[in-house]
Amino acid sequence: MIKTRAIVLHRFPYSDSSFIVKVLTEESGIVSFIVKGGKKKESPFRGALDPLALSEVVFRQNPNTELQFIKEATLLDWHKDLRNDLLSLAKAQVITEMILRYAPQGVPLQEEFERLEQSLREFNETCGSSANAANAATSSSMQNAEQNATPSLNASATSASAIANSAESLSAIPASAHKSNIFARWLLDTCDMWGYNLDLETCSRCGHTLDKPAADFFPETGGFICHACLGVETPRARTETLQGLWALHNGDKIEHPEFTENALLAYLRHHIGFLKEIHSIKFLNETRKLFGK
């Protein structure tokens, strides 16, 4: 019997009452479960086997079959705040689909598990902090509106306190966990995990260390070009992409994350081949349009 933590990558119906669930486990890599009766309201697995949920599962692994029977599933983290942020949710779905389609099968994937767990936790924390800050600001505005035309000293102090608490909540998030960086950081780390190391600080032509954003980037080779080597040539990469990759390297906030994410996806696509379509990328692109990002 195996007892391990697992993150749900994908779930789809198997019959009128059952699911097939694919999870990334901490000890056994990617495992597929058949969950009989999983659609029923009284199912003991409700919530614990929802997509993106972190749970502790117990199962007996049968090497002679692809589908395993799950015995127990205990929900550890449902990532509620992540689910309430549509753009972060879309990025998380791309991450889980890429792992499901391209991570090595049939082997332990502890590093992939740890990195995915970290990314989901960071999404959840930053989404929660942003929501709390927005709620505090709204509450402060409502309190001010309820005061007389000449607000009291106590009312002003309450408003200032709410704003200060919001700022403190946001500042408590590590620089590496800027919401704008999380997906790009996962992509960069995945390049390393899967053997496609990307050097963000060295010019691929002269070998000199970059001290500012590169002048150009080539996703086909992963090469960065310094300004001296580029000379009068016209760069192919957008300025937003180059600045974003430099911000990622330094752990700073990425102002236009969609360009950085697309550049890293293009690099991985070239090396992996992306023979299997990543369907959730279409949803991500539509969500970006919705939010203007």
Q: Language-model segments: which ranges?
A:
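Non-catalytic alpha-helical scaffolds and adjoining flexible linkers that form interface surfaces
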Residues: 1-19, 24-136, 142-154, 162-293
